């Protein structure tokens, strides 16, 4: 199917590079709501650091929730962990399907901790915040995505066992202190749309 197309677009990170007409940057959904409004809806002050714990849309109950209280100067938001909105001190648990748009949560956070996946990577990339990323050994693309994070984004890798045990929580201050990566490149979706528009106008080939 790929080879039968007349024009080819790939988006970074690319797992299998080929001869293409355009390699665009990471493509992510844009936030719908401003950072301050999202934090207000969550009940989190702008002055308080917020860390988003995400498994990329997969419902997941975390066994380390109680340990998050040890970092009481930081608010943690974990989607997919419960059936309804819960506020437990400095921890906010959200249901798998909530009123909060995932890119909005990423944009409202100061750092993200979660599994390596394309959509989360792209959202964190454009939010320009640190990423504590969990490699998934059973997924072939995990190594390529992790390499891209290491070369283009702030943050560090977290072993799956360390994540599940909650030992990573001690490194939250280190994650928040990571220097931000400032960039002005457009969302890959815009670059791809511009390319298609030029094709329709007869300006690309």
Describe each model-derived feature in a short phrase:
Residues 17, 60-61, 120-121:
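Short glycine-rich, flexible loops that bind phosphorylated cofactors or substrates
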Residues 1-30:
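Active-site-proximal region of nucleotide-activated glycan assembly enzymes
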